[in-house]
A protein has these predicted regions:
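Membrane-interface micro-motifs in multi-pass membrane enzymes
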Residues: 78-83, 125-128, 191-199, 249-264, ...
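Long extracytoplasmic/lumenal interhelical loops at the membrane interface
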Residues: 349-367, 379-415, 436-441
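Transmembrane alpha-helices of multi-pass inner-membrane enzymes
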Residues: 266, 314, 456-515
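Membrane-interface junctions at the ends of membrane-embedded or membrane-associated helices
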Residues: 145-153, 210-222, 275-279, 324-327, ...
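A membrane-periplasm/extracellular boundary helix in multi-pass inner-membrane enzymes
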Residues: 47-56, 122, 168, 235, ...
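N-terminal hydrophobic segments of proteins, predominantly signal-anchor/transmembrane helices
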Residues: 95-195, 447, 460-463
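Hydrophobic transmembrane alpha-helices and their immediate junctions
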Residues: 417-461
Length: 515
């Protein structure tokens, strides 16, 4: 072969090799482009401003670290073999929820009420599926703001501001809880962190829905899924032979939480009475669900458990008064007549069952906790600590640890009078916003939701006085109780979401008209 032919042959070989290499590279590049197209841009884009890797890489690193930290717990419980499949499912869940955020939102009721999975913490409570999913959604929202919007921007609605202040007060109270207020042991640090987590997740659930609902249809999906799960559960409750199957499907700590009932009643009754755009059959079914809740919770000895039905009764009266004042006045008059003719009904609230003993012990517990808090009335004793201080003051002659069974007393004991005032401010601002929205939101689902949420807010205020149902106390209902209490803050966040979607703000004179 002469030099010319040799050079030509070499050129041909090089060209062929380059084409082959290109042919090998092109599919992987196309695959990479397709993967990037399937994922949100902000997940695969490097955070150059902070010199950090892409959020997806950060999420995988975080999962790896969590796996390393939690592996001893899995090994101790004999579940080490679940760690790798769990990590794979976790990464897949992160990707899916990041792409379709609405799937994560509507999965919250299902995870809360039907998914038993929980990560053990070595204490009396574990990190359940509802907490994990909510933390994932909050983390993705935060990463979205950092990576895509390049700033953390929150709504300026007063309830949003109040919820943020409440979180700050809880963190400050946690700091005060590290001080030795009494010459005895305080709560273990994991228990204090658990108590703080409940406070912060409550505010986080509210902020998440307020900001992440992007269209009224997404809120509809969240409500319909919640009501559907509730309907299935109470259908089981109507038929005792099905209880064994029911206990396999539903998580006891979720479906027996009283907050679950008041929001079922509030949202279902609001849609049944005032959403005239909803088909009549669905409205009737929503009304039947309300009747089922009252029937199941008041039959037999259930009437002794007033947390199961009394707050829901306040929800019904409030919804009737807001939407149909004449109907509300009639309901109140009818109820007053029943009480006049049957005064034993009212006295039975505190005397039937174990209510008499419960009333006496609770009043004494509140008196003792008031004495304990005197050392720091402004910010309280910190998260979960008062439970270990109570034996210093005998209750009915016994030196035992106890909790208050009252959210207002709990808030004062853990975050002081400052925490209670901020919580009441949060509630007042929500009522003010909802009242302002009544005449400004469109008919149909939005207005029915606002009325139902205001009814739920009143029921929540009543319920908080009957137990730690709204912000669970770590040593009583605990993180497992957050499965139900989360709904309070999710659906109150929906109230702010509707205000945002329709441009309603009591602080502005020139509001956007509902479209």
């Amino acid at each position: 072969m002469n030099s010319a032919n040799w050079m030509t042959g070499e050129s041909t070989l090089r060209s062929s090799a380059q084409e082959t290499q290109a042919a090998r590279v092109e599919p992987s590049a196309a695959d990479e482009q397709g993967m990037a197209a399937w994922l949100p841009d902000w997940m695969v884009r490097r955070l150059s401003r902070w010199n950090l890797p892409a959020p997806l890489a950060l999420a995988m690193i975080t999962l790896a670290l969590m796996g390393a930290i939690l592996s001893p717990l899995f090994a101790a419980s004999g579940r080490l073999g679940l760690l790798i499949p769990g990590a794979i499912l976790g990464v897949a869940g992160v990707v899916i929820v990041a792409k379709w955020r609405i799937l994560g939102l509507i999965a919250l009721p299902i995870a809360s009420l039907m998914v038993r999975f929980a990560i053990g913490t070595g204490s009396q409570t574990g990190i359940n599926a509802a907490v994990i999913l909510l933390c994932l959604l909050l983390g993705l929202w935060l990463l979205d703001m950092i990576a895509r919007e390049r700033q953390i921007r929150l709504l300026t609605y007063r309830p949003v501001v109040a919820s943020l202040v409440f979180g700050v007060v809880a963190i400050a109270a946690f700091g005060f809880g590290q001080l030795p207020w009494y010459a005895t042991r305080s709560a273990a640090l994991p228990a204090q962190f658990g108590g703080l987590l409940i406070f912060l997740l409550s505010a986080g659930a509210f902020l998440l829905i307020a900001h992440q609902i992007r269209d009224i249809s997404e809120l509809k999906w969240l409500v319909w899924v919640f009501l559907a799960v509730g309907l299935v559960f109470f259908t089981f409750r109507l038929f005792p032979p099905s209880y064994r199957l029911m206990t396999r499907i539903f998580v006891r700590q979720g479906v027996l939480g009283a907050a679950f009932y008041i929001w079922l009643v509030g949202l279902a009754l609001g849609q049944a009475l005032y959403n005239r755009q909803l088909a009549r059959g669905w409205r009737i079914l929503a009304g039947i669900l309300v009747l089922m809740v009252f029937y199941v919770n008041m039959r037999g000895d259930g009437r002794f458990w007033i947390s199961g039905w009394l707050p829901s009764l306040f929800v019904v009266v409030t919804i009737c008064l807001l939407g149909r004042p004449d109907l509300g006045v009639f309901a109140i008059g009818l109820g007053a007549l029943v009480l006049l003719l049957n005064p034993q009904v009212l006295s039975g609230l505190t005397s039937e069952g174990d209510n008499a003993y419960s009333t006496v012990t609770r009043l004494e517990a509140w008196r003792i906790i008031a004495e304990l808090v005197k050392v720091n009335p402004a910010f309280g004793l910190g998260m979960s600590n008062y439970y270990w201080y109570t034996p210093l003051f005998p209750i009915l002659g016994y030196r035992i640890s106890f909790n208050s069974h009252n959210n207002y007393v709990d808030i004062v004991a853990q975050t002081g009078l400052v925490g209670l005032l901020v919580f009441l401010w949060f509630v007042a601002e929500l009522w003010r916003l909802g009242w302002h929205m009544l005449s400004r939101v469109p008919e149909g689902f939005p207005r029915a939701y606002v009325i139902g949420a205001l009814g739920g807010l009143v029921g929540t205020v009543v319920l908080a006085g009957l137990g730690d149902w709204v912000i669970p106390f770590f040593y009583n209902i605990g993180l497992e109780g957050f499965r139900a209490s989360m709904f309070v803050f999710l659906f109150l966040g929906g109230l702010v979401a509707i205000a945002r979607l329709y441009g309603i703000d009591p602080g502005r004179r020139d509001e956007a008209q509902p479209g």
